Amino acid sequence: MMYLSKGLSVPEKDGTVRVSHCGRIFALGPEMAALWESARLAPQPVPLQKARFVERLEQSGLVVTTQEEGGLAFYRLLSGSIICPQAESEGQFSEAGGDGRIWRWIQYAGLRLTASELIRLEEQGTDPTPNLLGEEGRQLLTEKLYSARTILEGALEHEMEHSPARDGLVAVLLRLLHAG
């Protein structure tokens, strides 16, 4: 079993680790804080003796888990998350190439994109052009992403699981996560 942390770390005041997720702030004890922190930048295997703690984090929405392993596990963990830019990124990365293109989609699209949607854009070779970005580009972007076949709940996620662009996009997202 693998897991990936969700949410943002809130600055410590009294030594307690706090995590913000979906408008709520969670205070974590030492065990759960260590588990959350270890999977903050990359998926991690769930330690057998700590599975109970990971389950509690998942119930709170602070981690997502999967029984899969390898590239499919990374995809499933990321597809269960909405990808949002951090307000103030401390990391540095090149805006050139694939990483920069994906970053521009994440930063400037008129809606929050999922890993599946980003894979679809990569598969199509769609660049983040002004007519597809921002509030004004939201409708056109949605039409680019979805067809009558993929608009059904879970259809795009299932289709993108088998995309040749999947592993490359997942690698870019993990690099951006480290850079942020």
What are these regions (language model features)?
Residues M1-S20:
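Short boundary/linker motifs that mark transitions into or out of structured domains
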Residues C22-G180:
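Long, charge-rich, low-complexity alpha-helical segments
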